[in-house]
Amino acid sequence: MSEVQREELNYDVVIVGAGPAGLSTAIKLKQLDTNLSICVLEKASEVGAHILSGNVFETKALDELIPNWKELNSPINTSVTSEDFLFYTKTKSMKVPNFFLPNVLKNHGNYIISLSNLCKWLGEFAENLGVEIFPGFAASKLLFDNDQKVVGVQTGDMGLDKDFKPKDNYEPGINIKGKV
C-alpha cells in the first residue's frame, strides 16, 4: 500500500486543546510576540463544547492575562456573595462556622461561571489577537524528528468505516508542525 499524502501546515507554536490552559497559553504568547504564528487544535466541534462543568472562579490569573476583562463583555459576572459549608451525616447536616474554614475554602469575591462560556470567550479573544483555532480536529498522533524530538501532531483521518478502512469520502489527517 502506498504512503498516504498528507497536507502539512507549519506554525511557530502548536497547542493541543482549547481549554482554559491552552487558550491562555496562546493568548499570552501572542501578547508577548504578535508575529508568532499560533495554532490551537480542538477536538470538539466548537470551542467549549467538551467543557460541561461549572466553576467557582478566582480571577487573579485572568487579571494578569487580560487586565480589562471586565470591560470586554466576558461571561464572568455572577460574584459569590454568600457561602455555607455543611458537614453531612447519614441523617442530618450541620453548618460549619466560616471562621473554622481555611482561606482556600472561602470564595467570597470569586465568581460562579460556566467553563464552557469562559472557553468560548477566551477563544474569541485569542482569534482577535490572530491565533488560529481549528475546532473539530483531534490530534491523533505525535510527530517526531530524527532526534525523537516532538515537532508536531497529526490530526485524525476522516471518512473511515468501522474497521478503519477508507470510505469514498476519506480525507487523510493533516500534519501540523510547530517550532515550539
Residues of each region from the PLM?
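Feature captures the FAD/FMN-dependent oxidoreductase FAD-binding
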Residues: I76-S79, D84-V180
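N-terminal FAD cofactor-binding segment of flavoenzymes
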Residues: K43-K92
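Short, well-ordered amphipathic alpha-helices
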Residues: G22-K30, L62-I66, V153-K162
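N-terminal Rossmann-like FAD-binding beta1-loop-alpha1 element of flavoenzymes
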Residues: Y11-C39
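Short, flexible hinge/linker loops that cap or flank conserved catalytic cores
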Residues: Q5-E7, I174-N175
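N-terminal mitochondrial targeting presequence
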Residues: M1-S2
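Extended hydrophobic secondary-structure segments that form protein cores and membrane-embedded regions
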Residues: I38-A44, G178-V180
